[in-house]
Amino acid sequence: MPIGNPINTNDIKSNRMRQESNMSAVSNSESTIGQSTQQQQQQQQYLGQSVQPLMPVSYQYVVPEQWPYPQYYQQPQSQSQQQLQSQPQMYQVQESFQSSGSDSNASNPPSTSVGVPSNATATALPNGSAITTKKSNNSTNISNNVPYYYYFPQMQAQQSMAYSYPQAYYYYPANGDGTTNGATPSVTSNQVQNPNLEKTYSTFEQQQQHQQQQQLQAQTYPAQPPKIGNAFSKFSKSGPPSDSSSGSMSPNSNRTSRNSNSISSLAQQPPMSNYPQPSTYQYPGFHKTSSIPNSHSPIPPRSLTTPTQGPTSQNGPLSYNLPQVGLLPPQQQQQVSPLYDGNSITPPVKPSTDQETYLTANRHGVSDQQYDSMAKTMNSFQTTTIRHPMPLIATTNATGSNTSGTSASIIRPRVTTTMWEDEKTLCYQVEANGISVVRRADNDMVNGTKLLNVTKMTRGRRDGILKAEKIRHVVKIGSMHLKGVWIPFERALAIAQREKIADYLYPLFIRDIQSVLKQNNPSNDSSSSSSSTGIKSISPRTYYQPINNYQNPNGPSNISAAQLTYSSMNLNNKIIPNNSIPAVSTIAAGEKPLKKCTMPNSNQLEGHTITNLQTLSATMPMKQQLMGNIASPLSYPRNATMNSASTLGITPADSKPLTPSPTTTNTNQSSESNVGSIHTGITLPRVESESASHSKWSKEADSGNTVPDNQTLKEPRSSQLPISALTSTDTDKIKTSTSDEATQPNEPSEAEPVKESESSKSQVDGAGDVSNEEIAADDTKKQEK
């Protein structure tokens, strides 16, 4: 049967009645939260007592002060959308209506599309009240249809008053006899008479009543009779009195009834899943934040599950009222969402995860989602625009964090230290509410403009506050976070405390902010600015220290000799980082360690050695040629095995390792005689072959690659050049000599380090005879071959 038609018996418009019938169909399945017959009887009694006097008045316009509830917001949705959506629900949920025309028929087992038998009087549901989907008795149907109606008496008593206040959006159906929805006894008689007609819209009425009652409970009108208050406590404790006239349309009742009627709610959900779109009702004050139907407003789910909470349980509906905030009593505004205390500025649109889980698990009904979305909009509207002048400060990023608004949950902001080049000072900047507030490190002044921008105050008020400051420094040039009016630290702190943003800017207003930074980064004592500029472990003051003063123990240990002795020198246009390392202990791969010898610092070098170094950098290619095929050891660590070939990037098979000897004490002598040598423990091989200061590798080099001076004329000059010496085939001596020593692996045997160390000792002792003898032996070998 067309569900809406029988409702025409009422003076209400057919459209309204149709909607209401749809609502009632929905609410019947929902209200099937059956309670013990005693409770039902009690409910009926309460309803009869409190509501009957009001019954004849089906539409009373409630004074907005008394009825600030946003039911009309909610129910306009329910009507406009419920007309579309609740009708399919009607067919799904209340097949019994269609078949029998009345809920009262127990004969229709599939009362809900879910397939809950209509007779199933007691189906245990989480709320603890059995779902009495439809009882065979019409009289019982009344009570059964009532969803969690803890509040009927209240709602019904004032329903007549409240009904038409939202009338612009929806109309509250009167029972067939013209009595208000809240009058259960009359409803029962009407239903007995017209079970088909009145039952349908009675459920809708029940829904409306349910909403109104819940809202009434939430606000607990002074107008309500004390009896109503008692009914609250009783019914909330014992379980919602099931009132046939009360439809489960009120957001709380929907939630509760749907918790209990999870089955019926399942049937309802598919059509109504689109239902909760609050954006359809964008009232002037609403933010469109709740356009997402699933992001339920943080209406405290607990209040829904435990209706005993009375006003707090109503907070869900109250949140809908938010647009009318002017009408709400102050206590109600506080109650509106117990999750957010008065200080909470966070947009309530972001519910805690447990709320979401609650909503999804317990509230399957779509109308709940509808209310949730509405509540969401309302809540967001209230908390952001009404509650606090600074809507989003509670979260470090208004968009990001899911904090509940308490300062304890605020994530500590990150402090960034940057260098203000123009002012030659460091700056600490903390971002709050999307704005970076900067404090100078030298004089602790704070950018007052950005500080006040965090509060989201108007520009005029901000400028007025800043103009009142006696000490201020205006910066008009630079990056955005540096522009503005800079005020002293104390004044900035006072303003921040007055505007209640000091906590959000932690630790900007801690006097000794360096200590906080060091605590947060114990491993890195340097400020983050140094790391941001690429300089590690250097305190900010080192910006202004000469390079030579740097002491970087963490520098690379395999630094070339020239870098070590003359660290700030620019070798071949390549800037060498300044690292003065007293002792280099790196050992080339595959080489056994020699004795560690301390590097002479630059102050130990004589002036002429530095000049040698300088000339070395300019004339390096020539020096390499002049020195035979041994390139200067600039690019090698002290203990690295120096291959004449490897210096040039060529690796002939017959190259022999050249192991540097530790530094000798006669640095002056070697530096004078060795033009290209750098006193880093590596004495460059000299062209003269007879020197007693030759180290062992220089001797081997001379024997293998360079010819003593007395033989240079006999050798082709190319043999002394690095590349030709390595590649030329015309000098048999060189090839054979290197082939002899090619048998020595790159990793010298253990005997070799001893030999080399002994040779270095012989150097130090001035035992030149040994070296001369070895050279002579080598020469004889060459000549023989």
From Swiss-Prot:
Skewed-composition ranges (Polar residues): 1-12, 20-37, 95-121, 266-282, 304-318
Pfam families xref list: KilA-N
Signal peptide segment: none
GO BP: positive regulation of transcription by RNA polymerase II; pseudohyphal growth
Stretches for region Disordered: 1-45, 78-121, 202-355, 519-538, 642-785
Gene Ontology CC entries for this record: cytosol; nucleus
Protein's cellular compartments: Nucleus
Segments forming domain HTH APSES-type: 414-520
Principal localisation: nucleus
One GO molecular-function entry: sequence-specific DNA binding
Compositionally biased intervals (Basic and acidic residues): 687-702
Chain positions with Phosphoserine modification: 771
DNA-binding region as annotated in the record: 448-469
Similarity comment: Belongs to the EFG1/PHD1/stuA family.
Function: Plays a general regulatory role in the cyclic AMP-dependent protein kinase-stimulated (PKA) signal transduction pathway by regulating the expression of genes important in growth and development. May inhibit the switch from unicellular to filamentous growth.
Note: Present with 314 molecules/cell in log phase SD medium.
Name of this chain's protein: Protein SOK2
Species assigned in the record: Saccharomyces cerevisiae (strain ATCC 204508 / S288c)
Gene for this chain: SOK2
